[in-house]
Regions:
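Conserved donor-nucleotide/metal-binding helix-loop-beta segment in metal-dependent transferases, i.e.
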Residues: 1-30
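Short, P/G- and charge-enriched loop/turn segments at secondary-structure junctions
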Residues: 28-34, 109-114
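A glycosyltransferase accessory/donor-loop signature
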Residues: 41, 50-201
Length: 201
């Protein structure tokens, strides 16, 4: 309810920064200023009157059509390219992404406090990592919340899928080499200490 009562100051859409939202490569690719930000399209709080008035759906589709083959993140790139100057940034807890759990994600330090609060007290959880809660190998700290609702559906008794063995083995090997001190993981892939307790099985 709080989300729907947000005053967006006549912006077309309320958004949350992407988990790599301050990565300069986004702005080099899309051709606008880093100061405008790069948002995640998993949650969009739309002012439909503004969208209709400015014909934004058509503009997004036109952008997609004219940039075929150049959209690394598909609809998300197109939405950012069209709407970067017509957004209202919401607290990050409304789209809490997996990389918010990391020590050093591609997010400016000025946003870290908001990011930490979103990780520890999320309102909407966005399972953005490759291994999802419906994969047996999932070790997301909040996977149990997903299961709570999954069990209430008609699919709740289905067996979980197995993630790609090749992809999962790569993850395990990287973690093993990191623990042995042979090859350190890049900082953006290292979880903050308070979340390691979820990984001790």
């Amino acid at each position: 309810r709080d989300l729907y009562n947000v005053n967006m100051d006549n912006a077309a859409v309320g958004v949350v920064i992407d988990q790599s939202g301050d990565d300069i490569r986004h702005f080099n690719r899309l051709g606008y200023s880093r100061e405008k930000g790069y948002f995640n399209s998993g949650l969009l709080l739309m002012d439909l009157e503004v969208w209709r008035e400015k014909e934004l759906p058509n503009k997004v589709l036109e952008y997609i059509d004219s940039h075929k083959g150049n959209l690394q993140f598909h609809d998300q790139d197109a939405l950012n390219a069209v709407l970067y100057d017509d957004t209202y940034y919401l607290p990050m807890k409304y789209n809490s992404q997996f990389s918010f759990l990391y020590k050093n994600p591609y997010i400016d330090k000025s946003r870290w406090q908001d990011m930490y609060e979103a990780a520890e007290h999320p309102v909407i959880i966005h399972y953005t990592n490759k291994i999802k809660p419906w994969h047996r190998e999932c070790i997301h700290p909040y996977k149990d919340i997903w299961f709570e609702y999954y069990k209430k559906t008609e699919w709740g008794k289905n067996k979980l899928r197995e993630y790609s063995k090749k992809g999962y083995m790569k993850i395990l090997i990287k973690e093993f080499l990191n623990k042995c001190g042979i090859r350190k993981l890049n900082p953006p892939t290292m979880l903050r200490e308070e979340f390691y307790k979820f990984y001790q099985h």
